[in-house]
Amino acid sequence: MTNSAVATPSQTNPFDARGPFLLSLFMTLVGYSVLVALPAINGAWVDQLGFSEVEVNRVASSDLLGLFIGAVLTSFLIRSWSRQNLTYLGIALSIVANGLCTQYVDYETTLILRFVAGLGAGFYTAVAVASLGAHSKPREAFNWMLLAFAISQFLELQLIPHLSMNGIYLFFIATYVVTLPFVRLIPTTNPPTAAQDTPTESRRPTLLAWVGIGAIVVAYINIGAYWSNIELAAEAAGLDGNWAAQVIAWCVLLSFGGCFTAMWVLKKFDYDRPLLFTFVLMVLAVGLLAFNFTAAVFVFSVAMFNFLWIFIDVYQMGGVSVADRSGSAAAFIPGAQGLGQTVGPFAASLMLERGWGFDGVFVLCALASATALLIYTLIYFTCRHRPVV
C-alpha cells in the first residue's frame, strides 16, 4: 500500500465541526446575496433610482469587481492573516458601504460605494468558501452550500421586489450584523493535510486547480451577463415584467434538482463527462434567446439555466478544492466568480450602449459557456488516464 494521508485523532479537521461548517454555509449566503438577487436589484435601481440599463450593468459590475479584488487579496492573505480578522474586515466594509448607499443615490457615488461593498463581501465570502473547501469532503460541503444557496435565492427574489431601495441596503446590513457574534467559531488554523483521505500521488496536480479557477471566470461571464439582463430582456421583448420576475423566482427552485442530481451523479459517474454534457446544454439554454425570445423559450431558458448553473457550480468548486488543499485556490473562487460577473455585465453594457441589443448579450453568454466547455474538454483529454480524487 502506498503512503495514504489518513486522518488520525490528533489530526482532526476543525473545519468538519458542525459550528464552523454551519457558519460557513450561512456566510456564503450572506456574501453572495447581491449576486443571487441581481435581477431584482437591477430592477430596483432602474425603477427606484432611475438608472439606465447601461448604468445598472456598470453598477453591478462595480459591486462584483469589489468581490473579485477582496477574494484575490484573501487568497494571498489567508495563510498569514487570521481568518477571523479577515471576516471582521469584510463585515466592516460591507456595513459602512451599504449604510452610505442609503444616503447617496446618484449614479457616480453609488458606483463607488457598490465597489466598496463588494470588496467587503469579497473578504467575507472568500473566508467562508475557503472554510468549506477545507472540509474533508469538499464536494459534499459545496453541494450543501449550493442547496442552501437555492433556498436563499428563492427567498431573496420573493422579498427584494417588495422592499424600498433603502430597505434592500438595510437588509444586506442586517445579514452581516447577525454573524458578528459567531465569527469566533471560525478556526484559526489551516486544515491538516491528512484530512484528505486519498493517497498523495492520486491527487490532481495543483496546476489544475488554477486552470479550474480560470474556467470558473469564463463560466461566470455567462452567468453575470445572463443573470443581470434576463428580466430586462424579457420586458424589452414585450413580456410582462411582473410575470417574468415570478418566472425567474420560481425557476430558482429547479436549483434543488441541480443539487440532488449532482449528488447522485457523483456516486454513479466520473467527474468530467457529466460536466461536459452540462455545458453543452448551457450553451443551448442561453443561446436560444439570441434567436427567438418568446414566452415559451424564455421559460425554458430560465428553467434550464437555474438547473444547470448549480450543477456546474458543484463540480467546479469541489474540483478546485480537491485539487488544492492549502485553501489558497478555494479562497480565490469568489474572486473568480466576481471577476466573471464583473466582465459579463460590463461587456453587456458595452453591447447595449452600441446598439447590439439583448441578442448580442445572449450570444456572449453562449460563447462564454462554449469556451468553458472547451477548457474542460482539454482537461478531460489531458487527465483522463490519471487517477481522479
Regions found by a protein language model. Name each.
Residues 97, 108-117, 296-304:
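Paired small-residue
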Residues 122-136, 310-324:
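Intracellular juxtamembrane helix-capping segments at the cytosolic ends
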Residues 269-316:
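C-terminal transmembrane helical hairpin of 12-TM major facilitator-type secondary transporters
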Residues 69-105:
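Conserved MFS/SLC helix-loop-helix module at the cytosolic interface between two early adjacent transmembrane helices
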Residues 70-83, 258-271, 352-353:
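Helix-to-loop junctions at the C-terminal end of transmembrane segments
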Residues 135, 141-188:
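Helix-loop-helix hairpin linking two adjacent transmembrane segments in secondary transporters
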Residues 39, 207-249:
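Extracytoplasmic gate region of multi-pass secondary transporters
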Residues 323-357, 365:
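A late C-terminal transmembrane helix in Major Facilitator Superfamily
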